[in-house]
Regions:
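The core hydrophobic/aromatic register in alpha-helical repeat solenoids, strongest
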Residues: 7-10
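C-terminal capping/lid segments that line or modulate ligand- or cofactor-binding pockets
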Residues: 64-84, 122-210
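A short secondary-structure junction motif
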Residues: 13, 41, 45, 152-156
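Extended ligand-binding clefts on enzyme/binding-domain cores
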Residues: 1-5, 16-128
Length: 210
């Protein structure tokens, strides 16, 4: 999916910046080929959900139905411009990914969300939580995600790679700038000017560059 978007951007750059019609056409043709492949082989019919996008297919009829907590991901498809949040296949995929039917979805007392095979089992990733919020279509879901992210703070006012949703004091990678940067984008783009954000007093926040 990300390749489809990137190749479309590449085609536009080749045409408008470098005025290279041939390269623009090649990039566009490859984009269209990848898109046809996704729509032909990447959609899998799943009971309860309908057709959803598979995380991986092998060309022989087998599919892995899950998602990765990083970006790009299936959940992040509207965020990076592949589709719209109200696309029916994306909506079906999203419902599956944010359910117990997704083997990488975990739920605890503090938060629930998508984890990764790269981190301990049952740990969820703030990155995936933020993407859930940024692709949500309702204010209530955005607020819910924001509340979970704030509740995941172990006391250092930072988001980490992953955390135990039953005990945020247990986390991986103390210094991990990516989710903190994306969290800023989430708040600015989704909540700017909203007086209902439960941000509390931020006067004691520490900003470090390491």
């Amino acid at each position: 999916m990300f390749a489809v978007v990137a190749l479309g951007d590449m085609s536009e750059i080749e045409l408008k910046v470098y005025h290279n019609v041939v390269k623009a056409r090649e990039a566009r043709a490859l984009r269209d080929e990848v898109q046809r492949g996704i729509q032909t082989y990447g959609l899998v019919l799943v009971p309860k959900y309908g057709y959803i996008y598979a995380y991986e297919v092998d060309g022989f009829g087998h599919a892995i139905l899950t998602d990765d907590a990083n970006i790009p991901s299936l959940l992040a498809a509207p965020y990076f411009g592949y589709t719209m949040p109200n696309d029916r296949y994306y909506e079906n995929t999203r419902r599956f990914l944010l359910s117990q039917d997704n083997p990488s979805f975990y739920q605890g007392h503090v938060a629930r969300g998508i984890g990764s095979y790269h981190t301990p089992e049952h740990y969820i990733w703030p990155l995936a939580l933020i993407v859930e919020g940024m692709t949500a279509t309702s204010g209530a879901e955005k607020q819910d995600v924001l509340g979970q992210l704030l509740a995941s703070d172990p006391g250092d006012h930072l988001l980490h790679e992953s955390f135990n949703p039953d005990n945020p004091q247990q986390f991986t990678r103390r210094s991990f700038g990516w989710p903190n940067a994306l969290f800023s984008e989430f708040v600015i783009t989704q909540f700017e000017g909203d007086p209902g954000i439960p941000m509390g007093d931020t006067s004691d926040l520490e900003f470090r560059s390491e």
